[in-house]
UniProtKB/Swiss-Prot annotation:
Origin: domain of life: Bacteria
Protein's name according to its UniProt entry: UPF0398 protein YfdB
InterPro entries, sorted: YspA
Pfam name, any one: YpsA
Taxonomic placement: Bacteria, Bacillati, Bacillota, Bacilli, Lactobacillales
Family statement: Belongs to the UPF0398 family.
Organism for this UniProt entry: Lactococcus lactis subsp. lactis (strain IL1403) (Streptococcus lactis)
């Protein structure tokens, strides 16, 4: 696989409001293991959409892995105004999404709901698969994007769920 889209729950979805929460270290350890597998299979691009939570933690891990693996990181934002109203600590995270190998904005500003569909279609057409932290038993708006991914038989979808995190937690405590 050449390009992998990263998506998943936000920190709000997960009830994580502090980066020092033990759940963050469990999630990041799981991300590291999964990304290393993808990279060792030849992954060349990791693509983000610029969301907080899972995506941001995956971005941190990916940037660390760039010292040992040869791959590129890109962020494709929906709008140039993405995150402009975030608080100061989240602005730092937004800046991290912009300090990657490739940054693109699908649209300048929001004009209509159809832009979200066009944006989703664009990122799916320009990636070969996705690594998504999503558990079908804990639905969020991600449900629709995951369904859209699964409709395309040529699109690889790798789901990370709460069971995977439980396994990581148990390994950490052995």
């Amino acid at each position: 696989m050449n390009s992998l889209l990263i998506m998943g729950y936000t920190s709000f979805d997960l009830g994580i409001f502090n980066e020092k929460d033990i759940k963050v270290s469990i999630i990041k350890k799981t991300i590291r293991r999964k990304l290393i597998n993808f990279l060792e299979e030849g992954l060349r691009w990791i693509i983000f959409t610029g969301n907080l939570g899972f995506e941001y933690w995956a971005l941190e891990v990916a940037k660390e892995l760039q010292t040992d693996y040869d791959f590129q990181i890109g962020t494709i934002f929906s709008f140039e105004t993405h995150g402009q109203n975030w608080n100061e600590s989240n602005q730092v995270k937004l800046a991290a999404f912009k300090q990657v190998d490739f940054v693109k904005y699908a649209f300048e500003t929001y004009e209509s709901p159809s832009q979200f569909r066009q944006y989703n279609d664009f990122i799916l057409e320009n990636t070969e698969g996705a690594f998504v932290f999503y558990d079908e038993e804990n639905e969020t708006k991600l449900k629709y994007m995951v369904e859209k991914m699964k409709q395309n038989t040529n699109y690889e979808v790798y789901l990370l769920d709460f069971e995977d995190l439980q396994e990581t937690f148990e390994e950490m405590n052995e």
